[in-house]
Structure formats: C-alpha cells, structure tokens
C-alpha cells in the first residue's frame, strides 16, 4: 500500500494487518483475498484521501482470486529490474498478461524499468519503446537511488529529486490508465 501522506488507522483496522515494516496488507486467507466490497471500501477511502492502493501480484497473474484486482480500468504496472536476466523474462511476463487479459490488458500495462545498479547494465529505453510501441500503454524508468536498495521503509523526502519525479510519472501514467486516457507508447 502506497500513500502520499498519513492515512488514519480507523479506516484500515478492520481490513488490514500491519507488517513489521509498517505497510498494510489487505486480509487474505489461503487462496481467498478480501471481498469485492472490502476492495471497494478501501479503494474509496484511499481516493477520498488522495492516495492510491498498489497491489503486488508477483507471478500470480492467472490466479482466479486476483481477478477483481485486474478488472478494467485497473492499471497494470509491470516492474522490470534493469538486468539482462530480468529483461529476458519481460517477454514471457507480457505474454502472460496478453494470454490472461488479452490486448486490452496489455493496453493498460505500464512497463517500468527500475535501475538498481549505478554502474550496471543500462537498457536502451528508446529501443524498448520501439519494440513495444502500440502494445503497452507506456514505458517509464526509475533511476538508480541508493535509498531504494536499503531494504527498509524509506521516507519520500529522502529519495533523490529525480527518483521522486520518476515515481510521480509512474503514478500519473497509472492514473491516466485508470481514467481511460488512450495515450500509448
């Protein structure tokens, strides 16, 4: 769950457990997630506060119990670490989205390249845009930021201005998808 500011606990106590890092996890039992009503209640509460929910689905895209999270107009943000091995898996991840949700699912996908090494392999984003043009909604990049690799909760203000701006672009792209704006790569 990502929030731009504090969100009162009273809204979430009935729906979430709290991880040791302070993040909130929407209730889940076995292969059942929260009910559709719970998703709508939480989403409405977040929107009223000007913040958004982020659901990390990992590799479980095809799990039936996650279908409510993938329903239109929900944006799909596919994060790809800027490493050759991760880019080798990009094609299969996009194919999985296409196989599961069809072309409309791909059209709601924002591919986000996360640079995790200041001196490591760099992707040619223009070439990636050329390759994926017309298939996905957009492509964004997150620059390397030493704070992101620390493995702890990070204050927004501690991130480099370029990193904050990049996350704001990803957020704006996700909002545009959710609002049905048709811009694509």
Predicted feature residues:
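Phosphate-binding/switch loop-helix module in NTP-utilizing enzymes
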Residues: 18-69
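Conserved Switch II/interswitch segment of TRAFAC-class P-loop GTPases
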Residues: 74-92, 117-120
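Phosphate-binding loop that captures ATP/GTP phosphates
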Residues: 1-24
